[in-house]
Amino acid sequence: MKLTCLATGSSGNCYTLTSAAGETLILDCGVPIKDIKKGLDWNIKCVAGCIVTHEHKDHSLSFYSIRRMGIKVFTPYEDLDRIEADENVMLTEKIGGFTIKAFQVPHNGTRNCGFLIYADGQKILYLTDLEYCPYSFKNTKVNQMLIECNYIKDMINTDLPNYIHKVRGHCELETTKGIVATNNSESLQNVILCHMGVETCDNDRIIAEVQKIAPQANIDVAEAGKSWILRKGDECPF
């Protein structure tokens, strides 16, 4: 399986997850549709579907365009609003060879979902734009994490106009570390850190601190154009 970052950060977020069979699932679509098509090497036929965490444009910008192309888009926050669900309701969706469990995480009053994705015998946890995660997936034995680390507490300026939104709607380093620790196991192979604030993160420090939590895993930072081959621990690398 291959994970590719097309965009990450406050200007837009979009990733692709491609299975061994060649099916691609788009994770958030917060960039112009032409950028998504380019990131797919213009091969739209390979796209099984798209999942969107929440309504903010840096995550959802192109979802109408994707729907107009006949591609299935899973927007659980809309479905949950439609049924007036409380914060404990989860939804499950099957898209091609991907099974996606959506669960709710707090984002400063905006309905927002994290995803646990099952594909190729692996479990991938995707969390972004959250204050904290109210769930543990320890028993699931997650293989891969794509998780936000938006700021470090001692690097943030409390006079920022969006300070309250940042602390109530985004993940601080200690919170990210706590989520990794809670869900860590010998099965965890990669922790990819995303949606990192330019002025509020020290990448080297964050990688080093998360590595202490999961020494067996590869810890890396998401950047546009970067990709990772995701394998289970017992999978042959050749």
Question: What are these model-derived regions, one by one?
Answer:
Residues 49, 231-237:
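Catalytic phosphate/metal-binding cores of nucleic-acid and nucleotide-processing enzymes, i.e., regions
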Residues 92-146:
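Catalytic core of the metallo-beta-lactamase
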Residues 53-111:
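Glycine/small-residue-rich loop that forms an oxyanion/phosphate-binding "nest" at active or ligand-binding sites
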Residues 1-42, 111-129, 143-144:
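Conserved beta-strand hairpin/beta-sheet module of binuclear metal-dependent hydrolase folds
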Residues 27, 53, 128, 147-149, ...:
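Active-site flanking residues adjacent to catalytic metal/cofactor-binding acidic residues
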Residues 11, 55-60, 80-81, 108-110, ...:
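Active-site environment of divalent metal-dependent phosphoester hydrolases
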